Amino acid sequence: MAACVDKWPPAAYLCRLPEKFYCVLPDCTATDRPVVTASAAPAPAASGSSGDYVWDVLRAEAQDDADDEPLLRKFYHDLVLSRPSLESALASLLAAKLCIPGALPQDQLRDLLAGALAAHPEAGRAARADLVAARDRDPACAKMVHCFLYYKGFLALQAHRAAHALWSDNRRAPALLLQSRASEVFGVDIHPGARIGCGILLDHATGVVIGETAVVGYDVSILHGVTLGGTGKESGDRHPKVGDGVLIGAGASVLGNVHIGDGAKIGAGAVVLRDVADGTTAVGNPAKPIIGKKAAPQRRPEELPGVTMEQRWSD
């Protein structure tokens, strides 16, 4: 797997996007890493642009929906159209979802989330890359604003990014609070210590579990019911390390401090207990590489399984 994933420090994100989409990630420094083309992403409107590609598109889509559906006008106004930035909108939306009336006030939770996102701008850049990934990979995602408002996999991942920011600042109690609430509300349990890259799609997301010392690379797609867990016998660094461009099928379990190589595919229902090499398809319980295949050719980034979502395990 990519060495940069193994050495990746907490709360540090370097997002991969083609040059024309660098404005997706304000203040993001370009790297020499390969880039993934977000072919399905619409071009931003020329007028009224804020210079933030994703936020401009999100607001335009929200306005279109509000114009078409009067019932949704206040909803879209309160959560998107009245907000000055994607980070502000995200903090407000997550606070509305995760608050506990009478015990965890929405306004105080919003301030906590907004503070975490402001202190860690890399989390906002990652959220933008996640939105582009969902729009590009999920044929059911007609608009990025639908992913932003309605897709619990996206929302759970952004709650994790805020929790990870707090965890990295040694604010463990509020980080664990966000983890707990996200698990209760979204059915997705990601430990705030887990390190997760950009351009991630949690598709459907119900039942996804990611442990404390897990690392997930860039451009990874994970379906529902996936566990990146420990074996229950170790402490310390005990969770999987997932490379770039990996696709993990529904119901798969990857257990222990094993490495899943770049561009690998893990079949639905597989139980992975050993390392999986780059470009390899592993299926079964216990998971084994598919026999009789030639070594996978070096793929361009846009051809990696995590980007294409190609789920034919025998190719």
From Swiss-Prot:
Gene Ontology CC terms, in alphabetical order: cytosol
GO process terms (BP): cysteine biosynthetic process from serine
Enzyme class: transferase
GO molecular-function term, one example from the UniProt record: serine O-acetyltransferase activity
Region of interest called Disordered, as start-end residue ranges on this chain: 287-315
PANTHER family: SERINE ACETYLTRANSFERASE
Protein name per Swiss-Prot or TrEMBL: Probable serine acetyltransferase 4
Source species of the chain: Oryza sativa subsp. japonica (Rice)
Lineage: Eukaryota, Viridiplantae, Streptophyta, Embryophyta, Tracheophyta
